[in-house]
């Protein structure tokens, strides 16, 4: 989302600079024309953004309406979801792909979720959702005992994961890293991350589960 806004702003600035360059070179000698053209561009940009927002809301409404299919006909649900993904772009597409992977993981289709997350590269997600994306991928890979792949993901996206350690899902990041470290025979680091996971949440049920995992690792 933020990248989209950044590139849109840069594009608008470049267009405005182009008009001033054309005027300086004598191609455009009418200030009224220049200002009118700039105004037209801004109006088109605003209309384009409004249409994009309207389309996004329409897709989200459709996504909500088909959610009941997850329990009754998951294959049909994912077929409908794929149609929405194909029609989307930018942040919206990245977010829907993340949603698809999360849903697959929740219904115990982890290998499919991993394939989606591994083969897609979310260029438009904000830092928070990128953290969710790669944390989920890391956790699923460790869960499926694909430790080599998990290590590659951790090494490549460590900065993104660490940039989210102040968020409300920091305990999950620490726990997934701890599980990876434990499988890599780095027990001390694993315990350290579990301690940090406990410190980063007030949820007693989560703390209880993390403590149980810590006790298991310490045996």
Indicate residue ranges for each PLM-predicted region.
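Helix-turn-helix repeat elements of alpha-solenoid scaffolds
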Residues: 36, 66-79, 105-115, 145-155
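Solenoid-like repeat scaffolds
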Residues: 48-53, 82-91, 119-127, 158-166, ...
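Alpha-helical segment of the N-proximal tetratricopeptide repeat
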Residues: 57-91, 95-106
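"A position-specific structural signal for the A-helix of alpha-solenoid helical repeats
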Residues: 60, 64, 98-99, 135-139, ...
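Transmembrane-cytosolic junction motif
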Residues: 43-65
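TPR/TPR-like (Sel1-like) alpha-helical repeat modules
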Residues: 155-159, 183, 187-204
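Structural signature of alpha-solenoid helical repeat junctions
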Residues: 92, 129, 149, 168-169, ...
